[in-house]
């Protein structure tokens, strides 16, 4: 969903950048329509969980979870704000087809009872990745002692702004 918001920002000064951002994300779309929350263009193993942990993706290695479906709203805002030429309309039509495929995936796999409510399977899918809202439900997850992985997120950003190790253990 980050790419959607980045594209929306780009659209204020460069429509090509905005459409390129969305198309880069959509290159990682799975055959069944799912859009993963991370695409691993760089197969760096210093990030955890990395591409080898997820072991997912078609042409581009990816995570196995998604994030909130904001692309349709983003596209609407981009179209409302910009004058679109014929070449851009062709690109946008291609994007719209892929977004529709994603929405069909959400209905099929995340709302099989057609309740209108899409399910999430992991806190990272919510858009509220490290929110305290998850503290109570995650306490119910029993974790193994001494999980073998190295975090990189708390090395790049001050660890006081990142989840505690016990919370991260529950995420993974």
Where are each of the predicted segments found?
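Helix-terminus loop motifs that line ligand-binding clefts
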Residues: 15-96, 107-110, 114-124
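Extended ligand-binding clefts on enzyme/binding-domain cores
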Residues: 93, 103-172
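Short glycine/proline-rich turn/loop motifs
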Residues: 2, 51-55, 164-172
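Conserved H-X4-D acyltransferase segment
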Residues: 1-13
């Amino acid at each position: 969903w980050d790419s959607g918001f980045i594209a929306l920002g780009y659209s204020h000064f460069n429509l090509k950048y905005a459409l390129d951002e969305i198309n880069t994300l959509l290159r990682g779309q799975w055959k069944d329509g799912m859009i993963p929350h991370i695409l691993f263009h760089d197969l760096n193993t210093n990030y955890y969980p990395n591409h080898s942990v997820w072991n997912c993706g078609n042409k581009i290695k990816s995570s196995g979870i998604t994030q909130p479906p904001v692309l349709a709203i983003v596209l609407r805002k981009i179209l409302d704000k910009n004058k679109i030429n014929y070449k851009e309309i062709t690109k946008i039509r291609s994007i719209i087809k892929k977004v529709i495929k994603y929405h069909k995936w959400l209905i099929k796999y995340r709302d099989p009872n057609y309740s209108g409510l899409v399910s999430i399977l992991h806190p990272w899918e919510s858009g509220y990745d490290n929110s305290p809202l998850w503290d109570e439900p995650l306490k119910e997850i029993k974790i193994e002692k001494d999980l073998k992985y190295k975090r990189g997120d708390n090395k790049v950003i001050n660890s006081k702004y990142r989840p505690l190790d016990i919370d991260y253990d529950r995420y993974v």
